Amino acid sequence: MKKTLYTLFVLLLTAGLLSWQWEKTQHPALDKGEVIECLNMETQQAYQIEASQSKFAQMHLAPIQVNPANLLGKIVPFNAADGKTGQAYFIPAKKKSDKWLIVIQEWWGLNDHIKMEADQYFKDLGDVNVMAVDMYDGKIAATPDSAMKLMRGADMNRMVALIQGAIKHAGPKASIYSVGWCFGGMWSLQTAILAGPQAKGSVMYYGRPESNMDKLKSIQCDIIGFFGNLDQSPSPAMVNDFEANMKLAGKNLTAYKYEAGHGFANPSNPSFNAAAKADSYAKAIAFLKAH
């Protein structure tokens, strides 16, 4: 009997110690903003999976080589949110400005075409700092196969840290705008989500839309998007769903659709559509100036 009571006492004591240790090692609860930010990476992961397949690569012809004569910006370092250093192609405003345009590359990387786009936005917008974030940390692809390999090895958490670092680099009083194409179009929308109340306007060119309603509801700025009816990434059906989800979330999305395929706005793309590029660019500039 004594042996039984002793055994029972040991079991109860052990259970109590385990329970105390469990409570001691639990992490504090995340607030709603942190939950939205760190969970629900489905959109980025879905893009990474899709962009790692040959079918996606076939939609992207190797970019035409461009040789810019006099670029306006230079590569500068900044602190990413993961404690590591990031880099960006940066053009400071001619006069001190709290307006920042974050430019995000296509899946090729921060190549000369993106730098030229950053220069053009700087010229046409005027009073703005332009920061084209290097999402691949110095790597650039010249062929669909090499871009596909870069995407397969991409760390989406690192990319979130780069965007967060760029926003912090701009400063707490900065008004954050964003623009990107394809891979960058997806990240332009994610930038608006990550920037929270600092976000003032986001331009997305044929980027994968966000479908998570909590993330869509967290958006605090207007969105303008340009899509191709002949595109399959995102497909017209995905764009229609995006419009419906944004409406359901109570957010303002203006979507323009062109009879064009994927990458229609890239002059270095052999399937470039000049008319769609000109119209969408004029609308993008007007949108950014109005916000």
Label the predicted regions.
Residues L230-P234:
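Acidic catalytic loop of the alpha/beta-hydrolase fold
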Residues G180-G184, S188:
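Gly/Ala-rich beta-loop-alpha elbow adjacent to hydrolase catalytic centers
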Residues I219, G225-F227:
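Short beta-strand/loop motif that positions the catalytic acidic residue
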Residues T25-F56, L61-A69, I75-A170:
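Serine-hydrolase catalytic machinery in alpha/beta-hydrolase-like enzymes
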Residues A249-H291:
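C-terminal catalytic histidine-bearing segment of alpha/beta-hydrolase fold enzymes
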Residues Q198-R208:
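A conserved short beta-strand
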Residues E117, S235-N245:
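Short alpha-helix in the alpha/beta-hydrolase fold that links the catalytic acid
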Residues G171-W181:
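Alpha/beta-hydrolase fold nucleophile elbow
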